């Protein structure tokens, strides 16, 4: 009894000390040290004091007026909670478990103190009635944040059912939707060092999770789901952003599981399960004659189940720019339509799109260890531009058959590249290439290879280099000696076929075809 009384008195004394020092940050630092020293002698008090000390960084939305019944509008309470948490380092804005909070569209804006977390353990629901929706294309927007975490074991539900029913109709056998007013569920803009993990996102009126102009983002363990026929309900969309790492996500929606738009680079996707949906899409790129750039996308270990597309690159006619250094490997297709698809004639118009000569250049695309079943006869479709052909297309150990077990087909148009290992079905325009090991080495920077094809120069003084965008020149070299074998450096910023289409003899600055 005496020991318990003494412990209680000691704890009360500590509380008084904490209150007295609360206004002095330097005193607080010294106090923390004193508390730690004292608590080493009493473990039970240490646990209690630390629980209260840590609780000071948690901002529970209920404490700021939010009502967890799913009916009362908690928008203002969420905004107030954010404003308080934003000012404190390592703060946690908590949406508690076993509660449902109704929130209208809201912007959570920074900059904030570092290590801020928005932790959703309960459920957040949107306004389900389009007629009552406030004028905004985004439901929950996060902007101008650094070192920010959006996480939790809870659910963010866009309640998009009424939006889908009222905004779409079938025209000439195609579903056409009015997307002008349908909101995106979550958008993160102009932010760095962001982590999004473990949440369940569902039933967004339109896209579920969109990133714009972000850098250094990790997405892990998300579950994103919407009905197969829900229109334009992309899982994750990335625009004008770089350095993304996406892993261990399960996505099934009515549109792209993951879409990568222009201005994006260094995107890694690992251990993805996709389906239903439209697969992983790069694009669409080059719409309305615009310039587009996407580079260094790596997909490793993915499974596509009953998807409308698998690995898709889509560009509009009339655009310009470059999509390059794209690698897909270790992918399984299960009854997926269009498992491998490059479509440079992408068109969503109800009528046919006009043919145009310019196009986004597609270079250096690798498909490695892709296997499974296709729901469409053409398991591989490489439909490249007539005026700007695809170059550096590389297929290694690809085996796809129809779900019925019958052979599938490959349709390739203006696709230049090679295959190695197994290729089922065969593609008529691809030629045999290097071994898988050589194939891997080619992708590395400053790789040196022996080559003596396709160029010539005067006498023995020969300098050969690769040209990333040489003009069309069909004149063969005349009156010159064949070039001696040279060491060719394959640069990562100049994607080429293993046997490049054109060479430069720099001693007299002429370009030749092999």
From Swiss-Prot:
A GO term for molecular function: polygalacturonase activity
Segment forming the signal sequence: 1-22
Keywords: Allergen, Cell wall, Cell wall biogenesis/degradation, Fruit ripening, Glycoprotein, Glycosidase, Hydrolase, Repeat, Secreted, Signal, Zymogen
Enzyme class: hydrolase
Catalytic activities: (1,4-alpha-D-galacturonosyl)n+m + H2O = (1,4-alpha-D-galacturonosyl)n + (1,4-alpha-D-galacturonosyl)m
Family, similarity comment: Belongs to the glycosyl hydrolase 28 family.
Entry protein name: Polygalacturonase
Origin organism lineage: Eukaryota, Viridiplantae, Streptophyta, Embryophyta, Tracheophyta
